[in-house]
Design a protein with these regions (language model features):
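Intrinsically disordered, low-complexity terminal tails of fungal membrane proteins
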Residues: 1-177, 357-401, 478-490, 614-622
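Extracytoplasmic
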Residues: 14, 23, 177-214, 219, ...
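Pair of pore-lining "gating" transmembrane helices in MFS-fold secondary transporters
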Residues: 175-196, 412-430, 529-533
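C-terminal transmembrane bundle
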Residues: 193, 205, 222-225, 229, ...
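Helix-breaking motifs and short loop linkers at transmembrane-helix boundaries and internal kinks
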Residues: 195, 210-211, 234, 243-244, ...
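Conserved MFS/SLC helix-loop-helix module at the cytosolic interface between two early adjacent transmembrane helices
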Residues: 230-271
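Cytoplasmic helix-loop-helix junction between adjacent transmembrane helices
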Residues: 276-315
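Helix-loop-helix hairpin linking two adjacent transmembrane segments in secondary transporters
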Residues: 315-364
Length: 622
């Protein structure tokens, strides 16, 4: 608990206020002993011990080669049946050897331990080497051993984890600690996403009190959704700056989100409400920008999909449960009640975040460790890899890359263009439900405002069905297949989506043409459930496929995808009601169902031609 408080924003504030006298790190305590791997290297450097050259390490290299041979023999990922042939891996290693900034002796030490390699790769985006290494380490338990720091060719000593089971490494945290952090992130995500649609129950109240048109009354929802699509373009790259990290971004923006919830619930003019709702969405968006990255910090490749299922479920169910949470209360207490509920939900989450949410970013953790070791030893050669990388990094360059790169890739890469278009359509259709449900269930079936909110629980049921299907696929097929055959081509992750992509079209047409008085209300509700469950599976598959195929640009692509999805959803909220009013529910929903056919064609095209598209793309990993 002390470690969590120390790493949390409140703990860092206490340390700053007391000049690091409270909540000390191990390196700051009197009883701390510098690991022998560091002291030996520092002492050797002081006595100017020559670094072994490639010519006098022939025996060491032979031992390393033997170790690699034993590793390959026992590893399904590095065997002849794996993704890459041994000769290909050796060629790649030889090529990297010529460009490596590390000394030969240091590379020999590194090669003796898969865990040693892991600690450096955790700070990198997804690459083929990292994916294979993550899977390898998840499949085999290795004994605890000290990690030898690398020395660069210019004399810097790279600060790393002290041992392979270093408790400071988020991947080594206990299951309980990782579950706690994951729960906080999921609740945070749920609150922010619920804050979008929880307002829909208040639209009729605004229309009556301020004399608004229905399309105007939907603007506070659409601007909120647009804002949390814009936010990731800024918050995602900002949290990747090593000196900042993720936790400060979470805490500072959640503080503003919580504070803004108070004037939002009390504002007395429509223009002010629009501005405040936009700011709410903008400052709530880091959960959308960084939630998946936080899960990736803590979980290995094989376990990450399960963590992402939980996080995506929180985001998926939030908007659906918003009308349920506010529907009955708004009817009894007035339209402002839904906005007060956002404050009541956000406040406790913010307190937990600021007091107990630790930093998970490996570059940030190691950067701060390097600073402490420099202060302890007085040796400025002790640096983290992120500090070296950060020298070439500016906030403007990072933001420009995050904004420009997704646009460039979308126009130049057909696969990403399809993914962005399809997810935008799916997301827009999802948010159009908040405009069509009030035209169906109260009008055709006499439901009250509160009961319309209850209907939205079908999305929750759909999500549970989607979770069951996707987790069964992971548990019974994907993970065993990786353990047996290694990582297959990226398109193999799309197999569940090939079946699920028919669901959105079927569900929409079923809803559109059964939503009438002569047919029981359960029929259109089943259609929405089919839509929701199938969309959940499709989105999971797509969001795994993108970082596997485009590892170097995964963060930028997700930020761009978030913006496009939210922009389309913003528009769908505004055009949804006019569409359904003028065409009728059946024809209006059929238009959306027709658009969803793009997903069927595109998904099969991506599965068949994906490898060829990646081979031609300068952005993808083939």
């Amino acid at each position: 608990m002390t470690d969590m408080l120390r790493e949390a924003p409140l703990g860092q504030i206490i340390r700053w206020a007391t000049k690091n006298k409270l909540l000390k790190y191990p390196e700051e305590r009197d009883d701390f002993d510098l690991p022998s791997t560091y002291s030996t290297l520092l002492d050797a450097a002081e006595t100017k011990t020559p670094i072994l050259s490639r010519t006098n390490t022939r025996g060491t290299n032979h031992a390393v080669e033997s170790e690699h041979q034993r590793t390959r023999a026992s590893s399904p990922l590095l065997s002849d049946s794996g993704i890459a042939e041994t000769s290909e891996l050796e060629d790649a290693e030889t090529e990297k050897e010529e460009r490596s900034p590390y000394t030969a002796a240091d590379k020999d030490v590194e090669a003796l331990s898969l865990n040693r390699a892991r600690s450096r790769l955790e700070a990198m985006p997804y690459t083929e080497a990292r994916l294979e290494l993550e899977a390898e380490l998840s499949l085999a338990r290795t004994e605890t051993r000290p990690i030898v720091p690398l020395k660069t060719s210019d004399g810097n000593i790279l600060v790393d984890w002290y041992t392979t089971d270093d408790p400071a490494n988020p991947q080594n945290w206990s299951d309980a600690k990782r579950a706690f952090v994951s729960t906080v992130i999921c609740l945070y995500t749920f609150v922010v996403y619920t804050g979008s649609a929880i307002y829909t129950s208040s639209e009729e109240g605004l229309i009556r009190e301020w004399g608004l048109r229905p399309v105007d009354a939907s603007l506070p929802l659409s601007l909120y959704v647009l804002a949390y699509g814009i936010g990731p373009l800024i918050w995602a790259p900002l949290s990747e700056i090593p000196v900042i990290g993720r936790s400060p971004v979470y805490a500072s923006t959640m503080a503003l989100f919580t504070i803004l919830s108070l004037p939002t619930a009390m504002v007395n003019n429509f223009a002010g409400l629009l501005v405040l709702r936009f700011l709410q969405g903008f400052f709530g968006s880091p959960c959308l920008a960084n939630g998946a990255a936080t899960m990736q910090d803590m979980y290995s490749l094989l376990h990450l999909p399960y963590a992402l299922v939980a996080w995506v479920s929180a985001a998926y169910c939030g908007p659906a449960l918003g009308p349920l949470l506010s529907g009955f209360a708004v009817t009894a207490k007035g339209w402002r009640w839904s906005l007060w509920e956002i404050l009541w939900a956000a406040g406790p989450i913010f307190l937990v975040m600021i007091m107990l949410l630790p930093e998970t970013s490996t570059p940030n953790i190691l950067l701060r460790r390097a600073k402490r070791l420099r202060k302890l030893t007085g040796d400025n050669r002790l640096m983290s890899q992120s500090e070296i990388d950060q020298k070439e990094m500016t906030a403007f360059k990072i933001l420009a890359e995050a904004i420009v790169k997704p646009i460039e890739i979308t126009f130049k890469d057909p696969a990403i263009a399809f993914v962005n278009l399809y997810t935008a359509i799916i997301y827009g259709i999802y948010y159009s439900f908040f405009e069509v449900f009030p035209l169906v269930y109260p009008v055709s079936y006499g439901f009250s405002l509160g009961m319309v909110g209850v209907v939205f629980t079908c999305i929750l049921i759909a999500c549970m069905i989607g979770i069951a299907i996707y987790c069964a696929y992971l548990y019974f097929y994907l993970v065993p297949d990786i353990m047996k055959n290694g990582l297959r081509v990226q398109e193999s992750r799309l197999v569940p989506a090939l079946f699920a992509c028919f669901g959105p079209t079927i569900g929409l047409f079923m809803f559109g043409w059964t939503a009438r008085e002569s047919i029981h209300w359960i029929a259109p509700t089943i259609g929405i459930t089919i839509y929701g469950a199938s969309v959940f599976v499709v989105m999971q598959c797509i969001f795994v496929y993108v970082p596997l195929s485009y590892p170097q640009y995964a963060a930028s692509l997700f930020a761009g995808n978030d913006f496009l999805r939210s922009a389309f959803a913003c528009g769908s909220i505004l055009f949804g009601r006019p569409l359904f009013v003028h065409l009728g529910v059946g024809k209006g929903v059929s238009v959306l169902g027709g658009l969803s056919v793009i997903g069927i064609i595109g998904m099969f095209a991506l599965w068949v031609f994906g490898a060829r598209l990646r081979a031609r793309s300068k952005f993808a990993m083939s």
